[in-house]
Amino acid sequence: MDDPLKFFEEQKIIAVIRAGEHSDADAIAKALIDGGIKIIEITPSVPQFTKLIENLAKLNQVLVGLGSATDGEQAYRAINVGAQYVSSHYTDKNIFTVCKNNNAVVIQGAATVTEAIEAYNLGIDLIKIYPINFLGEVPYINRLRRSFPFLKLVPSGGVTLDNFLDYIKAGATACVIGRNLCDKGLIRAHQWTEITERAKQFTQKLESLKVAR
C-alpha cells in the first residue's frame, strides 16, 4: 500500500478482530473481506497474531494493522511481518518511535482536548477518540473538528450501523468497529456468513453516502 493514510481516508471502516482461537480469527478476516472490508486490525489476543498479520499483508487491496498494542516490542513484531499501522488505546512514545522508525502509520488514543492536541503535537497520524460512547458520541467529534479542523480523528468504542455515517459526516477520518461487526456470539457459533452480511451493511451504507455526495 503506497499511501496508507489516504487509504484510511477513502475506506473509513477499520474492522477489529478479537478471538481466542487463531482459526476463528482467520475465518473472521475472510468473512470481513468477503463483505467488502479492506482495513483489518488484529489484536494481540489472537493466538499467533503475527502469523495472521503476515498472511493478510500478502493480500492485494487489504490494509492490515496491529490493534490494542501495549508496547513497542509488539509493534515491532507486527510491522516486521507486514503490518502497515499500529493502534493503541493511549499515547505511548515507545510504540510511536517504533512506528516512525519503520514507516508505519501510528494511531493512538485520546479522550480529552488536551490529550488530542498533545498527540497531534507529538506527530501521531490518526488520533483515536476512545471510548467515544462515554465521551459524547457524535456531538463530541463534531465539536472537536469544528474547534480543531486539523485533527484526524478516529472514533472507537460504540460505533454502530445506526451512527456510523453520523461520525463520518461530523468529520471523522475513519471509524473503528469491533463488536458491532463480529460479536462474541457470532464467533462462538461460527456464523461467518452473518459477519459477512454485517460487513456488507456497513460498506453499502458508506457507498450510499459517497453516491449522495
Segments (PLM) and residue ranges:
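Conserved N-terminal beta1-alpha1 strand-loop-helix module at the mouth
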Residues: 1-81, 101, 150, 161-162, ...
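Catalytic beta/alpha-barrel core
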Residues: 16-18, 38-46, 63-70, 83-91, ...
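Aromatic/hydrophobic pocket-lining residues that form π-stacking "cages" and hydrophobic walls in ligand
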Residues: 28, 95-99, 115
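Glycine-rich beta-strand-to-loop/alpha-helix junction loops that act as flexible
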Residues: 66-67, 155-158, 175-179
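Glycine-rich phosphate-binding active-site loops on the catalytic face of alpha/beta enzymes
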Residues: 89-95, 128-137, 172-191
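Ligand-binding grooves and catalytic loops that recognize ribose/phosphate and carbohydrate rings
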Residues: 105, 111-118, 122, 191-201
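Anionic-ligand binding region
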Residues: 113-127, 137-140, 144
